[in-house]
Amino acid sequence: VSGQGTSGTAVQGGTETVSATPTTVATNVSAEPSANTSPTQSSQEASAVLTNANQVTPAVPVQSETVTEPAHEGQTVDMQILSTTDLHTNLVNYDYYQDKPSQTVGLSKTAVLIKKARETNPNTVLVDSGDTIQGTPFGTYKALIDPVAQGETHPMYKAFEMLGYDAETLGNHEFNYGLEFLDRMVKGAKINIINANVRNAQTGDYYYNPYKIVNKTFTDTDGKQVTLKIGITGVLPTQILVWDKANLEGKVTVDDPMEAVKAIVPKMKAAGADYILVAAHSGIGDNEYTKNEENEGYQIAGIEGVDAVATGHSHADFPNGDGTSFYAKYPGVDDVNGLINGKPVVMAGKFGDHLGIMDVKLTYTDGKWKVVNSKAKLEKIDTKSDVADKDLIDMAAHDHNGTINYVRKEVGETTAPITSYFAQVQDDPSIQIVNNAQLWYAKKQVAGTADENLPLLSAAAPFKAGTRGDATYYTDIPAGPLAIKNVADLYLYDNVTALLKVTGAQIKEWLEMSAGQFNQIDPNSKEPQQLINSSYRSYNYDVIDGLTYKFDLTQPNKYDREGKLVNPDASRVRDLAYQGKPIDLNQTFLVVTNNYRATGNFPGVKDAAEKRLLNLENRQAIIDYIVSEKTINPTADGNWSFVPNITNADIRFASSDNARAHLSGQDAISYVGPSTQAGFAEYRLVVKEKANQVEDTTKKESEKSPKGVEMTDQTKRETPKATVGASVAKPAPTIQLSNAQVVILPQAQVQETQGSSSDKALPNTGSDESVSATLAGLVLMTLAGFFGIKKHEKN
């Protein structure tokens, strides 16, 4: 089959046809193998912790070379579509943060299910819905420490090739290491990488192949072979232009996902597609549509001509199969049979923990293949067994071992455990350490500049806080030696430090947005009330250190989870003070944060007068800080709390059952009992009256503030100042980012400590090398992508 897309002529070869060729990055425009192969890794290189695992051979992809007879009237085929998503470099079944094997993650585990499914029905299509090459220290290692070179294949894409994936679409996190890095990964891949809504900003052409027609030879119900032309396309959220603004601005544009699919389906039909599958890096969303929404899976399933949708991005599971899915409440959602708007839809969780399976019966009628019936389901990996795919483990062994050596490098020690079990309900050491490190680093970066005397604050959020129903998704670092794996557990994402110049009024709006983390509490109710808004992502709950403040939870949230103003007169932020005095809403502050926040649309941030992207990852700043301090005493300064007008309320929240071991000294938190969610428990928070309240001195300030800004009592306590070094940074040239100034500061000037070396030294996993020399090299490794290496979304 050949056809013409909007940006190029189709390329035909072997058993597959590329339906459109982008002008910028070509992926697999020939069916012939590429010369860009990765060296085969020996099984003897496999980590010792894995050699005793029970292993199986990899699933063998269905071959499509057989010459078949044309389809005939009444011919019936039973096809299955297999789907993975949001693998986030979980290739080997290993937890790099805990430094031990894990049976709850890994494509090496999912591959066992893929083989089983193909044995059940060889008429199989296999796709992935994105967020593949970023997410664990394995991803960091292959991007920054031992980066995949030009012409090499990323281990994740090599695994897809080995398993016979028919196509993969890109996710938002694919862009975290910069467009140049992604271009190199796409060119080195020997699988079909597709996307239909990212365009070249200069030409308007598709940046990637917008779709692929894959000729699949299936066996019909009578045992005869027949070829079907499966059209596969993919889309991702338009929000990548915000999340990776520094990487993408002026280089690409992004079409609305639903509109992009609507536009490409007729082209796929014209190219001969018998069946159209959308691999959407998009959550399911809901039944209400607004253009450029982050999650449009529901709407995509309703597009005429779309036959099936493999969703992702939200790290959720669909279908549940019993009508209990979160999405079951929406019209047109059949959670029992896995249908949305009459089409089979799956979302296969995250990290390889599920395989999506869509079963489709097709009959050839009136010259076309027509769907007779469809259904979808999820199959969970076997978490009780260590069975994994041997060939994938062998292929990844060299990079897997390199990652382990990298994360085991010691950088300091902690006198007490560092956990995030209670980081959403009280000021917490896990966030305090990040803020202390950011202040330590930023102070040196502004020393000797015109902004040297501006008040300096720091913002950080709890990244691992049981997000999306995962009771294992918390930071849990034991007392004792601290290694890079622990810092990666503490600071999950490959963000880059950034400085914002904002006013006191903007800081208040920033905190109002953060306060969306909490549900509104009725102070008069005697019924249990849940404190945490589960729909709000914990990585958006910024704690700003250098100030003191309280949250009034009797008030509604001012902004929704997307940052949209929903209650203009609401004011949850009270007693906002700097150095013990009510904050001046007109005063200018510097806030050190990360590039994800700095380039986003967060209230109070998006209108910052100046945004400076620095030259060092946040994680590396933490490493350097720990190296400098040598020993960390994990305590929080208690700079925020709740207004004590809910002291009689029964306030509950969920956290891991493992948090029970850390209740000692937590006089405001108590264990209630097990949760209905596996691995979680319910806890009670008691908000106590605070002593030493002082006279309300904020009235004059609030009179100057915009409508809705209200601040009352003030505490006498002065926020502790961070200990900083004495290095001096020179002013740097300025460039423009949107309407704000962006200053590229000189390469990070890390204070010299005993045993340190030149910051030009590359990272080294040898135990005899200096820790500082080993880690300072990450600065240079980061330079190529520092403009926007960031987190995601995760969702």
What are these regions (language model features)?
Residues L50, A117, A167, K216, ...:
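Functionally constrained cores in energy, signaling, and assembly domains
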Residues V67, Y165, I240, N247, ...:
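Generic signal for short, ordered secondary-structure residues
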Residues V105, S129, Q134, L170, ...:
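Short glycine-rich loop/turn motifs that provide flexible caps or phosphate-binding loops at active sites
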Residues V1-K100, G106-V125, S129-E152, Y157-K158, ...:
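Intrinsically disordered, low-complexity segments of exported/surface proteins
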Residues V77-Q80, N90-Q98, Q103-K115, E119, ...:
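Catalytic centers of hydrolytic enzymes
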Residues V67-K380, T449, L456:
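Acidic, metal/ion-coordinating pockets
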Residues T66, G151, A167, N197, ...:
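Short secondary-structure boundary micro-motifs
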